[in-house]
């Protein structure tokens, strides 16, 4: 069993080429058409696991941490932390739900540890599904609802007509169980 966290394009390539059985991605209005075409071209299927409204991940000590809901205007003074997408530096492949945001301060990172360290050290933020596990990530990063009227569909991709291994099935079951209680 290998768990890799990588760029969106690599996830699609890895599943298409058989390096990975599964990939976890999200679809929303700005990337769905492009990614769906890629799935079809690579003989992949997308299976929705859950829907989520956008949230921000911030430090528990962030100046906005006591807000129940955070607006884009309130976030403008703080660094927007986004994952680098390498050669496919297109917002269609962005890891962040709202990569289309035009924020005055942007920092690209390659991994979650760096992103969380900068969120804590610089009062930065990133936009995501809101799903965060305190057992895995600690209690320094919290999730707050972002005041936006849109939805993301989080799901998995796999090769069409593939028989999944017991590890893949167990992983899917764990994800579904965890996201059902979040």
What residue spans do the PLM features occupy?
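Central regulatory/effector-binding core of bacterial HTH transcription factors
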Residues: 1-33, 109
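Conserved glycosyltransferase catalytic-site signature
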Residues: 8, 90-92, 111-113
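Short secondary-structure boundary segments
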Residues: 27-28, 60, 87, 128-132, ...
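Flexible hinge/capping segments at coil-to-helix
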Residues: 38-80
